[in-house]
Amino acid sequence: MGFWENNKDSITSGLKSAGKYGYQGTKYVAKTGYKASKKHYNNSKARRERKSGKKNSSDEEYESEDEMEHERKPTDIRSLKDPKSFPPPPLKPGQKTYTGQQQQQMPNGQASYAFQGAYQGQPGAGSMEQSQYAQPQYNQYPQQQLQQGVVPQQPPIYGEQVPPYGSNSNATSYQSLSQQNQPQYAIPSQVSLNSASQQSTGFVSQNLQYGTQSSNPAPSPSFQNGLQCHQQPQYVSHGSTNLGQSQFPSGQQQQPTTQFGQQVLPSPAQPHPQPQQQQQGQPLPPPRGQVILPAPGEPLSNGFGQQQQQQQQQQQQQQQPLNQNNALLPQMNVEGVSGMAAVQPVYGQAMSSTTNMQDSNPSYGASPMQGQPPVGGQPPVPVRMQPQPPQPMQQGNIYPIEPSLDSTSSTPHFEVTPFDPDAPAPKPKIDIPTVDVSSLPPPPTHRDRGAVLHQEPAPSGKIQPNTTSSAASLPAKHSRTTTADNERNSGNKENDESTSKSSILGHYDVDVNIMPPPKPFRHGLDSVPSEHTRKNASERAVPILPPRNNVEPPPPPSRGNFERTESVLSTNAANVQEDPISNFLPPPKPFRHTETKQNQNSKASPVEIKDEVLPGHPSEEDRNVEPSLLPQSKPQSQSQSQFRRAHMETQPIQNFQPPPKPFRRSQSSNSSDSSYTIDGPEANHGRGRGRIAKHHDGDEYNPKSENSTENGRLGDAPNSFIRKRAPTPPAPSRSEKLHEGAITSEVDSSKDANKYEKSIPPVTSSIQAQQSTKKAPPPVVKPKPRNFSLKANEYPKELTREATGQDEVLNSITNELSHIKLRKTNVNLEKLGGSKKVKDSSPVPSDLDEKYVSASGSITPPRPPPSRSSPKKVPPVVPKKNDNLKKKPPVVPKKKPLLKSLEPRPIEMERAYSGDISAADDNLNPFERYKRNVVPQEDDRLHKLK
């Protein structure tokens, strides 16, 4: 039985059960997943619709009601804890005061700003209320007077407030500041400031002091001085009232401390009764805006209870002055609020003018001063608040930070905005002062802008300020330009023209325009000559003059002088145009060049010119005469210049005969064909001059050398030419000298015959140089025949092999060319010496040399040397090559297979054959060079190394 048959039932049942449960499981998972995804989709959809204002009741069912309720129902404010019970939040590291402001309803109906930012100091023992009220003390709005009598004013202040404390809250808040540095100072110790002084003193320093009291109370007085000045004017009217006096525990309302600034601050150690006495001693009412800084001498132990009692008593006493002050306050509030509100925006300084501080507040503002002086033990310096009119402060203060102050509102106003985490961080608003545009000067305009600029120059020098002058002068200019417009509208056409002219002349400013108008006037003055010159200039395409002439009306007086100058300019312009005409004179110059090319070529070799050209160049003198004529021809008519050109052309033709150049060329070509068969002066001119003139110094040339005949210059030329023919081939340096001195030799020959100078150097060099150029580069070929030595015979064996290998590459044409060159060179070589030919000639090398010559195709003697130092051997071989080369070109292919079978060619053979070393190196295969000799040696060397 098979395995399947035995287990078939169990296997099938297992598969069925597995499939069944698997299906159920997958179905369940699919359902749950579908439900979950659907629910999630519905929830998200409901949220999206909720945001868009749509609602789906069916979708909302899936959403958790808790979340919905939580999202929908904001917490009731009444259920929240009173923020007053919370301590103030910590200040940021660079923050001195809180920027938030409150409007506190004064019982008088005046709202006061409370800078609550100043909770820096921790409330001292028993100073909790004081610290609480420290913030409300920054009632920038002139609360000062009201706070004394009103307890509820300060409750809006955040922090722990002790509502029972009435006006004391101000004092306590003041104490809180002092407590921060010196909690022991009680308000009673402070000198109560008159309500006006308190208001005026609503020290900015107080605001600052919240941030700084603990650390730097001392600088506060200075701040008070500077800041108070802004705040003081608001409270000036109240200077007479004495609200702060009630603060003192003595209950005595000290008469206005006549010298708020003058009063000497008692040392902090002194108990408060002393400052009271001092103040009492001072009968004079305090000047408006001046503040007396109370000396913080009393410890807080005085307690709020005493102060409260005292203040409560005082409130009754002070209600009368308060009522009086209240009558003044609405005005003060109106003025002071606007001014102080402007001060408030300053966050760093707590500019929120706490000038509004109630009686305790001014002393409170002074507390920082008090904090420091007690430390030093020295009496604090009194700070005087200078009265200032409140209105100027209003003007200067632009910041509209005033919260809507309702002097009539009876309840504190709280503005609370819910925290929005998504909202961007608030940034301090930059208040841009509004500026009256009419008061600003007109913006500068580009000088090229036509309207204003044309207007300004229109008046004849009346408008002096430059358009580019400072912006301060611009308004005046603007008005002037308007007047200029009126003038132009009045009908000054000439002014319009002058302005347009000035702009044409280059955008002159008003001052500059005085000068430019005369220029156009000068144009227009001399109508007759200027018109002629203008016509000439216009014909001659002088661009600037014609527009000026067209634009200008002719006022005679000023234009007369300038028109003369203009006529001169036109004549100059005509001359300038003649300059290109004179430049056109070069056509005769090219004729001169054709005639005087010999002279110019001689000039090309300055050394020869020194010796030879000077006698032989009347043509140059003629040239010198010509340039003198050229400048003269500029003012003259072109016909005269052309006539002179023709005359000049005739002069160089007379002095120099151009025909010999082609004649010499014909000789050079004939000489190349005839190979030194040239006779007579022509041959002498052809070869000898080129050889003679290598360097104007004839000493360099030996009598044997071609150039040596330069010694016989001019008259000796024919004889020297004969001598030169024989020595020409052997000297390698001579051939180079011939190339170098070819131009110079022309100069030398110019002494005898000026005509032949130019043509001679190419002719002399043409025998060798031209032939060399045909078959091989002349510099390479020339040294080879001259430098041949006995070594050349040694190399030719390899050379012939190489040459034969390359003869295949060389065509029969190259062989023929090499034969031709050999013929020409053979003449020279034979003249040089036939003995060398005998020595050099050898049966085997001669064949090799012939093949080699065909391969190399060199003009110079046969064997293009692997070593170029064997010139002597080559020349004797050359004549044989001449005869043999004609017969032996078929022999070369025979040697080719032999040479191929032989060892590879050396690189030098390649170079000699190709004439270009770089090309030969590129064509060579290094393995071919070394394969027979070097490769087996390297194998042996490797074996040895092993």
From Swiss-Prot:
GO terms for biological process: barbed-end actin filament capping. Residues 59-68 have a biased composition (Acidic residues). InterPro entries: Aim3. Residues 166-244, 351-364, 463-472, 762-773 have a biased composition (Polar residues). GO terms for cellular component: actin cortical patch; membrane raft. It is a peripheral membrane protein. Coiled coil: none annotated. Residues 1-333, 351-903 are annotated as: Disordered. Its main location: membrane. The keyword Transit peptide does not apply. Keywords: Membrane, Phosphoprotein. It is found in: Membrane raft. Residues 93-105, 130-158, 245-267, 306-320, 627-642, 666-675 have a biased composition (Low complexity). Belongs to the AIM3 family. This is Altered inheritance of mitochondria protein 3. It comes from Saccharomyces cerevisiae (strain Lalvin EC1118 / Prise de mousse) (Baker's yeast).
